[in-house]
């Protein structure tokens, strides 16, 4: 602490302070006006922590100077771009968005409101963008490095728990660990990721236990609490279906029995529970390490759910990301039936649209979906639409629209962004060759500026 004070005191001789691994999170030296990078780190988390040491406002400090003595390759520059891009409100930072941010000097982050400006020369921009295009950021070496840096930051001898990722602002994206492939095998869970990177001192779970862990992990981030509350009841020793229902009902405002029935159906289908003669039983032998792992997973999922939906008035959060199976789960449909782009339920119509069409798709699947303005989205129905579907569209009271730019990137399926509700107008028949209908969906909420730039809609 004395060294920190001397560094900021103009009457002291101390001008520069060197340190290894102790000037990251939790250090506050607002008078620092220069940050030097002398050791390589490929962790965007560590980079942001170290950069943050110089970004505090202070008397007679108009700006901070960053000297990066190891930035001698564009690979390093890409890591810096990733670190800055992670400050975006967009939870999915795919290449298209990252390249857009680089081209525009990260203006969409709104850092200028805090007196922060970023300038990259044109030649460097093109080199960085070329590197972004050629690099696979979902490769195991990237994610393993993020994991190891986080573990070192926590100074924990064992693997970090699920809740460790919830409790640190500098944690990597845990859900990303659950979605990647290591070799030809998908991780499916945090446990699967840890096994894939050969983490030491892992508990050994049976195939039945792993199947339960994988299904519960597949529900993250939660769009409803029911499944996790059922499992929590089982871990607490409750097995009676009627008492479990009563307990869950107490915890969920506006509880509906059909929601719990739907959750139980797919918990059983996902091999997480067994239901017979009014009793519910957890799949997998009840062992201490297994139950401890599940409890940690439940705490993570439910804490994250409470943080996201504490003040929610609607089923879906505006401008947030959802997988198609999550939407189907929320509206009590089969989450496995996710190969369609349109669903109808209780007078509502659910539309899933992609803006960039995969070149490998058949022509009749390359729908002409696009933004006409920030509050009007053009949507094309399925080809050779049936009279029944056309009638359902005409009868729809409102349309809930989910949009994504690309379907997948580097082997990872990307979610949709929920852009809100709207209504169908201006149906146009006969303007396509495949017998579809073009509509304008007039949205109740126009796209915010950041999403306009993300979706690259131009007036």
Predicted segments with their positions:
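Acidic, glycine-rich low-complexity segments with interspersed aromatic residues
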Residues: 203, 207-216, 312-415
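Short glycine-/polar-rich loops that comprise or flank the Walker A/P-loop
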Residues: 30-34, 42, 59-65, 396-399
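Charge-dense, extended regions
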Residues: 234-237, 243-356
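Compact mixed alphabeta submodule
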Residues: 409-459
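Long, largely alpha-helical accessory region at the distal end of helicase-like NTP-driven motors
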Residues: 79-227
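Conserved segment of the helicase C-terminal RecA-like domain
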Residues: 44-49, 53-87
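SF2 helicase motor core recognition
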Residues: 17-32, 52-54
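Conserved helicase ATPase core of P-loop NTP-dependent helicases/translocases
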Residues: 1-23
């Amino acid at each position: 602490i004395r060294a920190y004070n001397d560094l900021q005191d103009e009457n002291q001789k101390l001008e520069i302070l060197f340190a290894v691994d102790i000037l990251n999170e939790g250090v506050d030296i607002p008078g620092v006006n220069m940050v030097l990078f002398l050791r390589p780190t490929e962790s965007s988390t560590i980079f942001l922590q170290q950069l943050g040491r110089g970004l505090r406002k202070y008397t007679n400090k108009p700006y901070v100077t960053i000297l990066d003595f190891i930035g001698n390759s564009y690979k390093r520059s890409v890591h810096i771009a990733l670190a800055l891009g992670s400050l975006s409100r967009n939870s999915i930072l795919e290449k298209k968005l990252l390249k857009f941010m680089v081209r525009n000097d990260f203006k969409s982050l709104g850092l200028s409101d805090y007196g922060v400006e970023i300038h990259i020369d044109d030649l460097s921009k093109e080199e960085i963008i070329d590197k972004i295009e050629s690099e696979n950021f979902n490769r195991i070496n990237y994610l393993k490095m993020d994991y190891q840096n986080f573990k070192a930051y926590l100074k924990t001898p064992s693997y970090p728990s699920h809740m460790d990722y919830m409790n640190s602002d500098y944690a990597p994206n845990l859900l990303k660990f659950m979605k990647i492939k290591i070799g030809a095998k998908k991780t499916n869970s945090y446990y699967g990721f840890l096994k894939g990177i050969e983490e030491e001192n892992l508990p050994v779970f049976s195939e039945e236990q792993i199947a339960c862990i994988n299904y519960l992990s597949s529900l993250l981030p939660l769009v409803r609490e029911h499944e996790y509350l059922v499992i929590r009841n089982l871990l607490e020793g409750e097995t009676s279906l009627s008492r479990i229902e009563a307990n869950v009902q107490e915890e969920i405002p506006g509880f509906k029995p059909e929601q719990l029935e739907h959750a139980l159906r797919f918990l059983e289908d996902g091999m997480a529970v067994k239901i017979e003669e009014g009793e519910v039983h957890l799949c997998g032998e009840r062992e201490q390490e297994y139950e401890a792992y599940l409890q940690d997973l439940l705490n993570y999922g439910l804490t994250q759910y409470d943080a996201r939906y504490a003040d929610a008035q609607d089923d879906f959060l505006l401008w947030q990301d959802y997988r198609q199976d999550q939407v189907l789960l929320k509206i009590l449909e089969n989450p496995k039936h996710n190969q369609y782009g349109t669903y109808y339920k209780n007078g509502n119509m659910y539309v899933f649209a992609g803006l960039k069409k995969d070149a490998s798709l058949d022509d009749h699947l390359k729908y002409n979906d696009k933004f006409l303005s920030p509050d009007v989205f053009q949507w094309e129905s399925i080809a050779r639409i049936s009279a029944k579907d056309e009638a359902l569209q005409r009868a729809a009271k409102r349309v809930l629209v989910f949009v994504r730019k690309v379907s997948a990137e580097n082997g990872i399926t990307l979610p949709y962004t929920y852009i809100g509700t709207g209504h169908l107008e201006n149906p146009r028949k006969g303007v396509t060759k495949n017998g579809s209908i073009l509509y304008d969906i007039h949205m109740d909420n126009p796209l915010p500026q950041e999403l306009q730039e993300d979706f690259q809609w131009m007036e």
